[in-house]
């Protein structure tokens, strides 16, 4: 067996690369034709039903507006019902056929069943399920002394997407519908100070990749990954994907290149309606895939030099509307080093990337 593996290790990689190099144009042509066809004849969302979790602000809010422009019927789900009322009114003015708001916590399976059942009872169908809830953090893992929020991070970033999908799938099968997931570039490009978030997003992406195979073509899956997004990053502020405005503080400045939440939401909805398997924004992040595969040491050096250099104080946090989660303590590290979670609201939590 060792001999067989040695032979395969020697011949399979170069043979695969040569085959891919020659077959790449042939593979791209049908994909381009399919993309053009779906752009022209993609899903017409007029009157169709879309459930959006984490809809009270940020990406979830902007996605609601994009579907409203397409005259869809919306079900807006979040914990902050008072925020949903204003967004629902805006969506109606923008063209939504009808808007239902539901206060629910998507990390609880019974509440997911409740809002899906309410959707079916009222509309009789579900065409798209858009999961946007997330919770980001910034801390060095080895400095954490209070681990009580670890399960919360994983519940929100993983189970907060899985439970709604599980409950909605039987109804999505009936309409040949689609599940849209708000993932992140950290799922394949993990960054320092975001260890648990990156792990949860990687698990999420791999879950939906597997689910895509299981569902075949009966229910579509669109995985949207984004890098830094925001509207005020040049002034040191950025809009978290679920809407809480935060201030990035660090003992040295960090320059960030990103894009507006509105643009990501527009691309995400357009890609879902075309039936795209993936939506990436900004697309230039793809270059890091090459480094990840062929030169991983370059990324390691870059992170050490640019993000977490030796000799720099590890004092970084999000400040703004942050508070404890459900009365639970925030993550703390030995003074003066404090690692804070971005604010949690199950209209979604705050998330950085």
From Swiss-Prot:
<feature type="transmembrane region" description="Helical; Signal-anchor for type II membrane protein">
    <location>
        <begin position="10"/>
        <end position="30"/>
    </location>
</feature>
<dbReference type="Pfam" id="PF00106">
    <property type="entry name" value="adh_short"/>
</dbReference>
<dbReference type="InterPro" id="IPR020904">
    <property type="entry name" value="Sc_DH/Rdtase_CS"/>
</dbReference>
<dbReference type="GO" id="GO:0005829">
    <property type="term" value="C:cytosol"/>
</dbReference>
<dbReference type="InterPro" id="IPR036291">
    <property type="entry name" value="NAD(P)-bd_dom_sf"/>
</dbReference>
<dbReference type="GO" id="GO:0070524">
    <property type="term" value="F:11-beta-hydroxysteroid dehydrogenase (NADP+) activity"/>
</dbReference>
<comment type="similarity">
    <text>Belongs to the short-chain dehydrogenases/reductases (SDR) family.</text>
</comment>
<feature type="binding site">
    <location>
        <position position="105"/>
    </location>
    <ligand>
        <name>NADP(+)</name>
    </ligand>
</feature>
<feature type="binding site">
    <location>
        <begin position="54"/>
        <end position="80"/>
    </location>
    <ligand>
        <name>NADP(+)</name>
    </ligand>
</feature>
<dbReference type="GO" id="GO:0012511">
    <property type="term" value="C:monolayer-surrounded lipid storage body"/>
</dbReference>
<dbReference type="GO" id="GO:0072582">
    <property type="term" value="F:17-beta-hydroxysteroid dehydrogenase (NADP+) activity"/>
</dbReference>
<feature type="active site" description="Proton acceptor">
    <location>
        <position position="197"/>
    </location>
</feature>
<feature type="binding site">
    <location>
        <begin position="197"/>
        <end position="201"/>
    </location>
    <ligand>
        <name>NADP(+)</name>
    </ligand>
</feature>
<protein>
    <recommendedName>
        <fullName>11-beta-hydroxysteroid dehydrogenase B</fullName>
        <ecNumber>1.1.1.146</ecNumber>
        <ecNumber>1.1.1.-</ecNumber>
    </recommendedName>
</protein>
<dbReference type="InterPro" id="IPR002347">
    <property type="entry name" value="SDR_fam"/>
</dbReference>
<dbReference type="GO" id="GO:0016020">
    <property type="term" value="C:membrane"/>
</dbReference>
<keyword id="KW-0735">Signal-anchor</keyword>
<comment type="function">
    <text>Has dehydrogenase activity against 11 beta-hydroxysteroid and 17 beta-hydroxysteroid. May be involved in signal transduction regulated by various sterols.</text>
</comment>
<keyword id="KW-0560">Oxidoreductase</keyword>
<keyword id="KW-0812">Transmembrane</keyword>
<dbReference type="GO" id="GO:0050661">
    <property type="term" value="F:NADP binding"/>
</dbReference>
<keyword id="KW-1133">Transmembrane helix</keyword>
<keyword id="KW-0472">Membrane</keyword>
<feature type="binding site">
    <location>
        <position position="184"/>
    </location>
    <ligand>
        <name>substrate</name>
    </ligand>
</feature>
<feature type="short sequence motif" description="Proline-knob">
    <location>
        <begin position="13"/>
        <end position="26"/>
    </location>
</feature>
<feature type="binding site">
    <location>
        <position position="201"/>
    </location>
    <ligand>
        <name>NADP(+)</name>
    </ligand>
</feature>
<keyword id="KW-0521">NADP</keyword>
<keyword id="KW-0551">Lipid droplet</keyword>
């Amino acid at each position: 067996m060792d001999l067989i593996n040695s032979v395969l290790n020697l011949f399979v990689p170069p043979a695969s690369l040569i085959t891919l190099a020659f077959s790449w144009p042939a593979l791209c042509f049908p994909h381009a034709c399919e993309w053009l066809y779906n752009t022209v004849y993609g899903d017409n969302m007029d009157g169709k039903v879309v459930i959006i979790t984490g809809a009270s602000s940020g990406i979830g809010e902007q996605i609601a507006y994009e579907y409203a422009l397409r005259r869809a019927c919306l079900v807006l789900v979040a914990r902050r019902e008072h925020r949903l009322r204003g967004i629902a009114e805006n969506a109606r003015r923008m063209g939504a056929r009808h808007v239902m708001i539901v206060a629910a916590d998507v990390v609880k399976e019974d509440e997911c069943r409740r809002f899906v059942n309410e959707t079916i009872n009222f509309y009789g169908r579900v065409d798209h399920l858009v999961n946007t809830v997330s919770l980001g953090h910034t801390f060095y893992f080895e400095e954490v002394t209070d681990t009580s929020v670890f399960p919360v991070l994983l519940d929100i970033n993983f189970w907060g997407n899985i439970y709604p999908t599980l409950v909605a799938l039987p109804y999505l099968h009936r309409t040949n519908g689609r599940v849209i997931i708000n993932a992140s570039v950290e799922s394949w490009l993990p960054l320092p100070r975001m260890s648990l978030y990156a792990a949860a997003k990687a698990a999420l992406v791999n879950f939906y990749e597997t689910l895509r195979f299981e569902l075949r073509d009966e229910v579509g899956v669109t995985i949207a990954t984004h890098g830094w997004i925001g509207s005020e990053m040049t002034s040191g502020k950025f809009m978290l994907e679920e809407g809480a405005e935060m201030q990035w503080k660090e003992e040295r400045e960090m320059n960030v290149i990103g894009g507006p939440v509105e643009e990501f939401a527009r691309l995400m909805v357009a890609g879902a309606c075309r039936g795209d398997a993936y939506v990436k924004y900004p697309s230039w992040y793809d270059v890091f895939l090459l480094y990840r595969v062929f030169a991983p040491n370059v990324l390691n050096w870059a992170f050490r030099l640019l993000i977490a250099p030796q000799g720099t104080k590890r004092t970084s946090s999000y400040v703004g509307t942050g508070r404890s989660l459900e009365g639970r303590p925030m993550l703390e590290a030995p003074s003066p080093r404090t690692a804070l979670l971005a604010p949690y609201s199950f209209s979604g939590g705050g998330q950085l990337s």
